[in-house]
Amino acid sequence: ALSSLVRIGTSTWTYEGWQGQVYTRPYAKSTFARECLGEYCQYQYKNEPLFRTVGNDATFYRPPTANQLRRYLNQIPEDFEMCFKVWEKITIPSYAKQPRYGSRAGQPNPRFLDAKLFNELVLTPYRDAKFEPHTGPLLFEFQRHGLSTDEFCARLDGFFSQLPQDFRYAVEVRNAGL
């Protein structure tokens, strides 16, 4: 058996291409993402559940709601953890020139590494849903940022010093300059 310290999972559970492999139950396209998490958690390898964690990158675009987290609780086993990407409003120093940002496109992000916003809008749903025992590392993805390495590290250090210690955090830097 695999050590209990090791968790195997994937970056998402919502890959429809796994139907017939990981997923054996039929799912309507409209409800697939909401309903298949429980079956993902039950997937067996050598008569043992294989997946004990999964990522959720949809939370990069908006924080989860307490109701979403409660729906997950109804589908996951007691020892299962989910890793969530942190909302981009916290992790991007300026908005890319993309239509999805509307009037903010190309503008600085005044909420970059805003610990108060993170505590209020990102962490609160986890607490309200009592999801903390199932929360794996919260993943901060940083892409291009236009800051010097020293400035970025100083801002990051200041930010993390304001966060509660009862959650775990991870940083993914997608910037060749660092």
Regions found by a protein language model. Give the residues of each.
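Residues lining hydrophobic/aromatic ligand-binding pockets adjacent to catalytic sites
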Residues: A1-L178
